[in-house]
């Protein structure tokens, strides 16, 4: 277990320190079927929609698939921009994990595109990456969690 309190770790750790290299991007004109195929092939729950200058113009996530795409009358030939979310919140790689967690909680999102000083996409931070980081930081605590949050055992062995 780390010597510093978790609050300090989250404030001191910068996003670039835990960032994974995977970044899925597409143009707004990408056909809906192509976007869904990309998400399936890459086993990811998001695509950053960026213009030809790599600036974020939207996000297309599993949530958009569930809320907008799984409706009658949707054409798989429509451009993904018709279904993407346009109120996208971004951060930079130098922002803290605490800032990312705060933004995810405040806006109800699980993926945050990262932009550089030119406002171009340079990465993505997902809640999964944050959880993996915390699990690696606190392995004993994570591995000893009960299967259900409300489950309490009298002994360490679970009996």
Residue ranges of model-derived segments:
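Tandem CBS (Cystathionine beta-synthase) repeat/Bateman regulatory domains
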Residues: 1-159
